[in-house]
Amino acid sequence: FVGNVPILIALSWSGLIYMSLSCSFLISGIDITGIFSYSVIILCSLLVTILDVVLDPIAVDEGRWKWDLPGKYYGVPLQNFIGWFFNTAIILSLYNLIAVHDVPVESSSYYVKYAPAFLFILLPLIAARPCFERNLKSAGVIGVSFTLFLIVSSITSSL
């Protein structure tokens, strides 16, 4: 455990943050660099938090999460989402402080460069299916809508 969070969740979130960061660069139209602006940090933190809005109701329904004071959104308290937003922002801000600023980012094909972003775009849609199966309709609608938003945003940013 890291605090009250199982270590595997912390490790999986590092991957989600990485994919969300790639997606943030894709939809903002900002080139991927070794360091990034605070607007990218905020966007990435927001994207990860919205994904959590889709994922956490499933975890609660499966009995993997439980809070002493459950929230109104499928038992998930608001401070959970606020916490993930700020944890992501802090992690990325700390990375920016310690990152080597003169490391060139290798150029590679568009699809290789943004492969993590493409996976992130699909995750809310993938998570929406079990939401609908478990009658977590709001979470499912958010998942489908979020994927559609990310698809449209990524297409319009590359025009």
Q: Where are the language model's segments positioned?
A:
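Aromatic-rich, lipid-facing transmembrane alpha helices and their immediate juxtamembrane interface loops
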Residues: 1-159
